[in-house]
């Protein structure tokens, strides 16, 4: 080989080896950096935004989950109550936070449905956040005041009583925590299913609504289990049915709506979301830890005591749930012509 050609070949070979080594080092370095970032997360305390006041069902569930996540992540999980606009104010703070997985939020069904009821949101409630996963469900129970409706012991008897009251021109009334609440929407769905019409009495929250049902001023209410359970257990209100797919541990003797011939089911729910653009490794870590936490026997027991069912789903499943529930209840709101207060 010509000396000049030999020199050129050696130079090219040396340069190729140098470039190959640098490329390998870069790939390895990137992989190690990514692995380190995943294992290092989180390096600071997390904030879990609860977009409702302290003491409610979402707040109760969030505090149980937050405490368990803190143990798993080895960092404090600080509960930050930011109520307002059916939860939209708090979730907007999450959506506009840095996508580092350090600010999380509890997105519950009232917030999902609020734009359907005229609440203005500055974000896309269906797609504007990063879904981490479903966290809990709260069974709904259909209950009546026994003194107001003494002969009603199941849903068929309630429907019969309602039809008789309609024929007499005095429809039975039902209480809800407010227009567009889950209690309101499922009762409207039941009316469509059965052909009965109740008179809606709207209150500002579960407490005053249940108080009037206890007093007999309003005989009927679909309530979340957290608010209803003490009165059902005390025998002050009669539980006719649960709206979940299966009977619940709190009231094992109370049949589902479907068991009684009414194909209607729905639970109130809440899930964990993060800011849009949160890196996939962080989402995966949070989803995995949430799954472990919700499977823990101690967490399940605490959730049950609070009237909640620990319910995990993948990020993709929770995202799909947001889309399907928005469509389902949006149809009810439209068909029943439900208007905001």
Residue ranges, per PLM feature:
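Residue-level signal for nonpolar/aromatic packing positions in well-ordered secondary structure
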Residues: 46-48, 55, 62, 79, ...
